[in-house]
């Protein structure tokens, strides 16, 4: 569950470091390596972007499935799209569970 969330962060780190600085693997091991880190967005912005990406992935999988029904896509393309959508959904579920757990812990705190 945590691995899926960390892999999302790794993909964004790789995208940021492409074309500049040392190899992406070096910046994954040492976050300070490479170029100066850009300003991170707010937590709500990051969650919004992840949600948008998950929805886009699921719509893409649905579209690929419909193409396969019409005979325009092969089985491998459908499986790849559906597996990508499933991974996005599992990540969203894991984040939701963590947020609910954190909320319940805060609600149980004594003031």
Swiss-Prot record:
Keyword flag NAD: no
Localization, UniProt: Bacterial flagellum basal body
Pfam (any one): FliE
Keywords: Bacterial flagellum
Main location, first listed in the record: other
GO biological process: bacterial-type flagellum-dependent cell motility
Cystine bridges: none
GO cellular component, as recorded: bacterial-type flagellum basal body
InterPro entries tied to this protein: FliE
Residue ranges of coiled coil: none
Family: Belongs to the FliE family.
PANTHER family found in the cross-reference section: FLAGELLAR HOOK-BASAL BODY COMPLEX PROTEIN FLIE, PTHR34653
Protein name: Flagellar hook-basal body complex protein FliE
Lineage: Bacteria, Pseudomonadati, Pseudomonadota, Alphaproteobacteria, Hyphomicrobiales
Gene: fliE
């Amino acid at each position: 569950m945590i691995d899926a969330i960390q892999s999302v962060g790794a993909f964004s780190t790789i995208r940021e470091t492409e074309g500049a600085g040392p190899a992406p693997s070096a910046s994954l091991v040492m976050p300070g390596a490479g170029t100066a880190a850009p300003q991170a967005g707010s937590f709500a912005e990051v969650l919004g972007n992840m949600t948008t990406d998950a929805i886009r992935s699921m719509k893409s999988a649905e579209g690929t499935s419909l193409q396969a029904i019409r005979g325009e896509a092969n089985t491998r393309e459908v499986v790849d799209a559906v597996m990508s959508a499933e991974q996005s959904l599992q990540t969203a579920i894991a984040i939701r569970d963590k947020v609910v757990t954190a909320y319940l812990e805060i609600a149980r705190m004594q003031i």
